[in-house]
Swiss-Prot record:
It catalyses: L-seryl-[protein] + ATP = 3-O-(5'-adenylyl)-L-seryl-[protein] + diphosphate; L-threonyl-[protein] + ATP = 3-O-(5'-adenylyl)-L-threonyl-[protein] + diphosphate; L-tyrosyl-[protein] + ATP = O-(5'-adenylyl)-L-tyrosyl-[protein] + diphosphate; L-histidyl-[protein] + UTP = N(tele)-(5'-uridylyl)-L-histidyl-[protein] + diphosphate. NCBIfam families: PRK00029.1. Its cofactor is Mg(2+); Mn(2+). ATP binds at G107, G109, R110, K129, D141, G142, R192, R199, D278. It comes from Ralstonia nicotianae (strain ATCC BAA-1114 / GMI1000). It is an enzyme of class 2 (transferase). Pfam families: SelO. Nucleotidyltransferase involved in the post-translational modification of proteins. It can catalyze the addition of adenosine monophosphate (AMP) or uridine monophosphate (UMP) to a protein, resulting in modifications known as AMPylation and UMPylation. Keywords: ATP-binding, Magnesium, Manganese, Metal-binding, Nucleotide-binding, Nucleotidyltransferase, Transferase. This is Protein nucleotidyltransferase YdiU. Mg(2+) binds at N269, D278. The keyword Manganese applies. Its EC number is 2.7.7.-, 2.7.7.108.
Length: 525
């Protein structure tokens, strides 16, 4: 693996920073070569760095402690002021569709991949987001701001706590350097971790530029590293497409089940590993609105909550188009897409491979919601029960998280007085309509074999008490702006175990206050 000297003109950025037991660094994506990336150093911060947030859960596989990172040498490496000997910083090139329109070449415009570390859990890429200009920055300045970095840090770890596949966030480091957005904001760098940051857009880039050897090399890299079972298939690239479709479907079902809205599901923000990637204008549902748009920049509602399953399929279709040259009858040869006799079989095969998304999503969606309702068996009337529930929640804008959390308290043999006293009714303004659905739900529970207590316990393991509501993130951001990082840490710790009770932090579980309705998040991070 090339050392950091390969990207420096002098030794001014060299750092001895290391920690005992650091996993071995080895070439991963970097082995693909210069057609896929550009090696360059980070741009040093013009102000002193300070630690804003640290995730011990994300750091555990790396063997890195907060005390080990929070040193002058450690802060310098993870803010981009210095390059450790185990690091080989680089930015990758990709393209993509943004809001349904081909955007051409994109790439890591403010992110640098520092290294791939071989942990006991497998490969772990370490990436700085906000590390300065790269050849792919386009009109950007290469920086990230404290506001968006805290949001990404907290949500990455919150999603991990929920058991949803995601990139992780090791730390956030701030620096009192001005960054111009809609206003002047404070600079920050978030360190992200993932087995790989390869996106759908990486494949689109080489397909669009007709660089077919590079397209094959990228697909082979992903298969050999992350989908080795595909190599044994007669059509390994079609097998890859199917497996990515399966993982993506499972991921989106998990998003929908917890009320997570990504906000900007462009193809360049879709992980080839089925991870939640790029936390920008995201949000969790407060009052349930199937058409909720969390991204203020999404004026057409393309990425609204209810649209996410279809958008994920659309993005997979773009990935399939990119892989078509590899999907012909002979996987060792490139398919000539200008020749209908070659192209049509590849198209048909890719379309068939994508069917796995529809089937997997449907199965995963209903399995998730049966679990949320405490139902262990599938019944013919369940879809109608679910549909009536979604209509009820949507019509009354009932708090999504609180409803499912309180639903565990319902008992199948509640007396009328007990039914009237259940807290779950409090999330509705029209309680008569809620009572009608709850009566149907109690009737459905009569067919379940599990006792009420066991069912309630199981429901509390899948229905979180805590999610990262926008107003909670906003409070943490405002306090961090005053150099009080305690709210970032408290929120991180609670969200790492969102299904548990946390005495002293019950206010994190409450509904959004009225002032939160004015909060807006957009792509301007």
């Amino acid at each position: 693996m090339p050392t950091s000297a390969a990207v420096q003109t002098d030794d001014s950025l060299a750092s001895p920073f290391d920690w005992p037991g650091r996993p071995h660094a080895a070439p991963g994506f970097a082995r693909l070569g210069e057609r896929f990336l550009t090696r360059l150093p980070p741009v040093p911060m013009p102000a002193a760095p300070y630690l804003v947030g640290f995730s011990p859960e994300a750091a555990a596989p790396l063997g890195l402690s907060r005390a080990g990172l929070d040193t002058p040498a450690g802060l310098d490496v993870f803010v981009g002021n210095a390059i450790a000997a185990w690091s080989d910083p680089l930015a990758t090139v990709y393209s993509g569709h943004q809001f349904g329109v081909w955007a051409g070449q994109l790439g890591d415009g403010r992110a640098l991949l520092l290294a791939e570390l071989q942990t006991a859990d497998g490969p772990c890429e370490v990436q700085l987001k906000g590390a300065g200009l790269t050849p792919y920055s386009r009109m950007g300045d290469g920086r990230a701001v404290l506001r968006s970095s805290i949001r990404e840090f907290l949500c990455s770890e919150a999603m991990a706590g929920l058991g949803i596949p995601t990139t992780r966030a090791l730390c956030v480091i701030g620096a009192d350097a001005p960054v111009r957005r809609e206003t002047i904001e404070t600079a920050a760098v978030v360190t992200r971790l993932a087995p790989s940051f390869v996106r759908f857009g990486h494949f689109e880039h080489f397909a669009a530029n007709e660089k077919l050897p590079e397209l094959r090399a990228l697909a082979d890299f992903v298969i050999d590293r992350f989908y080795p079972a595909c190599r044994a298939e007669p059509q390994p690239y079609l097998a890859l497409l199917r497996e990515v479709g399966r993982r993506t479907a499972a991921l989106i079902a998990q998003w929908q089940a917890v009320g997570f809205c990504h906000g900007v599901m462009n193809t360049d923000n879709m992980s080839i590993l089925g991870l939640t990637l790029d936390y920008g204008p995201f949000g969790f549902l407060d009052g349930f609105d199937a058409n909720h748009i969390c991204n203020h920049s999404d004026t057409g509602g393309r990425y609204a909550y209810a649209q996410q399953p279809q958008i994920a399929y659309w993005n997979l279709f773009c990935l399939a188009q990119a892989l078509l040259p590899l999907c012909g009858s002979d996987p060792t040869a490139f398919t000539d897409l200008s020749d209908e006799a070659q192209a049509q079989p590849a198209i048909d095969a890719a379309q068939e491979a994508l069917l796995v998304y529809r089937d997997t999503y449907g199965e995963a969606f209903y399995a998730r919601y049966r679990a949320k309702l405490g139902l262990t068996q599938a019944h013919d009337g369940d879809e109608a029960l679910f549909g009536d529930l979604f209509k009820l929640l949507h019509t009354q804008r009932a708090d999504y998280t609180l409803f499912f959390r309180h639903l565990a308290d319902v008992r199948r043999d509640d007396t009328p007085a007990q039914a009237q006293a259940r807290t779950v009714r409090d999330v509705f303004f029209d309680r008569d309509s809620a009572d009608a659905w709850l009566a149907a739900y109690r009737q459905r529970l009569q067919t379940e074999p599990a006792p009420d207590a066991a069912r309630a316990e199981a429901m509390r393991r899948v229905n979180p008490k805590y999610v990262l509501r926008n107003h909670l993130a906003e409070i943490a951001i405002r306090r961090a702006g005053e150099k009080d990082f305690s709210e970032v840490e408290n929120l991180r710790a609670v969200l790492a175990r969102p299904f548990d009770d946390h005495p002293g932090f019950e206010h994190y579980a409450g509904p959004a206050p009225d002032w939160a309705a004015s909060l807006e998040v957009s792509c301007s991070s």
